[in-house]
A protein has these predicted regions:
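Core subunits and conserved enzymes of cellular information-processing
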Residues: 1-132
């Protein structure tokens, strides 16, 4: 079966694993998903991730993060730009998520980065998702 929106599939798998209180989740690998996982780790939303190969398929194993009272580090993860309705923003139009408490992830000509990094570097791009 072919996925029409692999980014949304990754976010959904992570959300479902967090609700089920799993320690890790495997998602099919792609360069974009590895970059999203890297940003989530840098921003402290996941513990770690590892790109591996299992049974001939490349997968990303994402180790989820929970707080002291077993609350998930990610409260909400929403896909913004979709295959049927792409959302592009200029540097000045990049929204702040929860007044700076969350992050948004963009693909830019300089690579995948957070909204904060994109504003700092002065670039816009496709607004992939918002996480808090």
């Amino acid at each position: 079966m072919r996925l029409t929106d692999p980014g949304a599939d990754m976010l959904t798998r992570v959300r479902n694993a967090l609700q089920a209180r799993h320690q890790k989740v495997d998602v099919p690998a792609s360069r974009l998903k590895v970059e999203i996982a890297r940003i989530l780790k840098e921003e402290g939303y996941i513990s770690n991730f590892k790109a591996t190969e299992e049974e001939g398929h490349k997968v990303i194993r994402i180790y989820l993060k929970y707080g002291a009272h077993n609350e998930a580090a990610i409260s909400k993860a929403d896909r913004v730009s979709r295959p049927g309705c792409r959302v592009y923003v200029r540097r000045s139009e990049i929204p702040r998520v929860l007044g700076g408490m969350g992050i948004n992830i963009l693909t830019t000509p300089r690579g995948v980065m957070t909204g904060r990094q994109a504003r700092k570097e002065g670039v816009g791009g496709e607004l992939l998702c918002e996480i808090w």
